[in-house]
Amino acid sequence: ANPVVTFTMADGKVMKAELYPEVAPNTVNNFISLVKKGFYDGLVFHRVIRGFMIQGGDPQGTGMGGPGYSIKGEFTYNGFSNDLKHTPGVLSMARAMDPNSAGSQFFIMHETSPHLDGQYAAFGKVTDGLDVVNKIAEVPTDYSDRPLEPQMIQNMTVDTFGVEYPEPETV
C-alpha cells in the first residue's frame, strides 16, 4: 500500500492524501521525512487562489521559507519522467525558478491546471476531504492571495504501512 498522509486542520476538518513513491520517489521521501518531524504542524496555507490551488508548507508563512535544503525536481521538464497530471486534489511541490529548488512548500490543486504538468513535481493526491480543499480555496484573501483568516494545519501524520522510507537526497 502507498503511504497515506492525514492533514488535521485547526478547525478539526481532515484531509487524507495518498503519496505515489513510484511517480516521484525522492519527493515522497522528503514529504514523509518532514511530516514525521512535525515540520508542517502549525503552518498555514499562505497562498490561496480559487480555481487554481492552495499552497502551504512554509515555516515563515511568507512564501520564502523552507527546510534549509532543496531537492531535485522530479518532473519531465527537469529530465525526470513524471506523468501525474495537475488535476483537482493532486499534491505537488512548489519551487522558485530553479527546477531543483523545492524544499518543504507544497500545493494542492483546486482546479485542473495543465500548464503545470511536467513543470512541477506532482507526487500524491487527496483521496478523502476534497471538500476541505474546496473550502480553503474559497476563503477571502488579500491582494497577495493570503487568506484573511489563517488556514492552519494543526498537525500532519503519515501511515507508511510498515514500509521504511529513507531520508531524501538533497542538492
What are these regions (language model features)?
Residues 1-171:
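Cyclophilin-like peptidyl-prolyl cis-trans isomerases
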